[in-house]
């Protein structure tokens, strides 16, 4: 069955014109400038002739650039971010050095000449194989003799004999 290229159905109703006309579109719609410029002075002079509209090849990427930047204010206050390396001083350096010497991060593996970064998916795959090494095959559980062997082995390791 062939489909037409028109995605919008044709309207089955008609609108008849009336004598009432809207004189100004600004009565019902907000202008973009009203939303973006709420924090600045209303007395700042701006004319729409200062705007330049550039379009890309496809015509969908339209950008509007303002002509003057004099009336713009900062939208957020500056924040003081503490520098913890200066606050803690030598203690943070000492702690970092101790932690680097004692253990390797979870995503690094020791090699002959140093450490090697391991991608996270390989690291998870290695951990999963270690945790599911009792199971053989996808979706298979231990039953009967296999389960009793595993249970008896665990009891022997723990020191509890059945």
From Swiss-Prot:
Inducing stimuli: Induced by dark, abscisic acid (ABA) and salicylic acid (SA), and slightly by jasmonic acid (MeJA). Triggered by pathogen attack such as Pseudomonas syringae pv. Tomato DC3000.
Main localization, broad class: cytoplasm
PANTHER family: EMB|CAB72159.1, PROTEIN S40-4
InterPro entries: Senescence_reg_S40 (IPR007608)
Protein species of origin: Arabidopsis thaliana (Mouse-ear cress)
Name of the protein in question: Protein S40-4
Location of the protein in the cell: Cytoplasm
Protein family: Belongs to the senescence regulator S40 family.
Lineage: Eukaryota, Viridiplantae, Streptophyta, Embryophyta, Tracheophyta
Annotated signal sequence range: none
Sorted UniProt keywords: Cytoplasm
GO CC term, one of those recorded: cytoplasm
Domain of life: Eukaryota
Pfam families in the record: Senescence_reg
Keyword match Acyltransferase: no
Keyword presence, Cytoplasm: yes
Biological process, per Gene Ontology: leaf senescence; response to abscisic acid; response to absence of light; response to bacterium; response to jasmonic acid; response to salicylic acid
